[in-house]
Curated annotation (Swiss-Prot):
HAMAP family noted in UniProt: Ribosomal_eL39 (MF_00629)
Gene Ontology terms describing biological process: translation
GO cellular component, one term: ribonucleoprotein complex
Entry superkingdom: Archaea
Organism of derivation: Staphylothermus marinus (strain ATCC 43588 / DSM 3639 / JCM 9404 / F1)
Keyword tags: Ribonucleoprotein, Ribosomal protein
InterPro entries named among the record's database cross-references: Ribosomal_eL39, Ribosomal_eL39_dom_sf
The family this protein is said to belong to: Belongs to the eukaryotic ribosomal protein eL39 family.
Protein name: Large ribosomal subunit protein eL39
UniProt cross-references to NCBIfam families, sorted A to Z: PRK01242.1 (NF002316)
Amino acid sequence: MARNKPLARKLRLAAAYKENRPVPIWVSVKTRLKVRRGFRLRHWRRTKLKV
């Protein structure tokens, strides 16, 4: 990817970076481990962003 990115692309990449994190611990505790894993987790090599 280019070093100099347009601002819109940079903002979209930043948003995708922020939302790609696991479920908080308190959610697992509150739901008694019914929610263990975020279904929207994305691996950088398996699934590419449409940016």
